[in-house]
């Protein structure tokens, strides 16, 4: 065997060694993840229904964290929040909300539904055909009607659930709706 053939053979063996070593390291890194069983879902305090408005996603999370609910709630997001869960204009949204609530009760034993609508909601304008943000009192009344209607429907289907109704301003301030 010539010098050239010896070098080729060493290179081939070195590459084979590296390939096996890399595969072994990869397998050893994956093994714990594959052998570990997934964490069981724990009970959470509530299911939050809120609007999809990008302007308030961070404010909503901040609000929930400020209440001590970080990682303690399930979150359903529908355009219009309460209105999205009730509107006949988009019936699939109704179904989505109720199915998510059913699953949250089964998996996480939620005992409370928090419904968080917000001011200057574009979905209210699209679905109801009017810009309520121009008249704060009317906007409050319309949101309160939708929120209260959803609470009645939730309590009719799940009498043991507590339902909390909230309305958030664009600055993140939250007011309770009774």
Residue ranges of model-derived segments:
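N-terminal secretory signal peptides
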Residues: 1-12
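MPN/JAMM (Mov34/JAB) isopeptidase/deubiquitinase module and associated MPN-bearing subunits/adaptors
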Residues: 2, 163-178
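N-terminal twin-arginine translocation
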Residues: 10-16, 27-42
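Short, conserved "active-site rim" segments that organize catalytic pockets and cofactor/ligand binding
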Residues: 20-21, 25, 40-94, 168-174
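Short HxH-centered metal-ligating active-site micro-motif
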Residues: 71-136
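A structural motif corresponding to the C-terminal end of an alpha-helix
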Residues: 107-110, 150-163
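A short acidic, glycine-rich active-site loop
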Residues: 136-145
């Amino acid at each position: 065997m010539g010098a050239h053939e010896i070098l080729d053979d060493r290179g081939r063996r070195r590459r084979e060694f590296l390939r096996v070593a890399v595969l072994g390291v990869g397998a050893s890194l994956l093994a714990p993840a594959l052998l570990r069983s997934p964490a069981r879902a724990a009970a959470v305090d509530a299911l939050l229904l809120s609007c999809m408005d990008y302007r308030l996603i961070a404010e909503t999370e901040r609000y929930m964290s400020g209440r001590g609910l970080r990682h303690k709630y399930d979150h359903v997001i529908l355009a219009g929040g309460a209105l999205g869960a009730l509107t006949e204009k988009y019936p699939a949204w109704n179904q989505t909300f109720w199915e998510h609530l059913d699953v949250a009760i089964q998996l996480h034993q939620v005992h409370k539904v928090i419904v968080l609508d917000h001011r200057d909601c574009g979905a209210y304008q699209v679905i109801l055909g009017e810009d309520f943000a121009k008249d704060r009192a009317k906007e409050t009344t319309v949101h309160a009607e939708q929120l209260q209607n959803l609470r009645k429907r939730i309590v009719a289907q799940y009498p043991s659930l507590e339902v909390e109704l909230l309305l958030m301003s664009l600055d993140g301030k939250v007011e309770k709706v009774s």
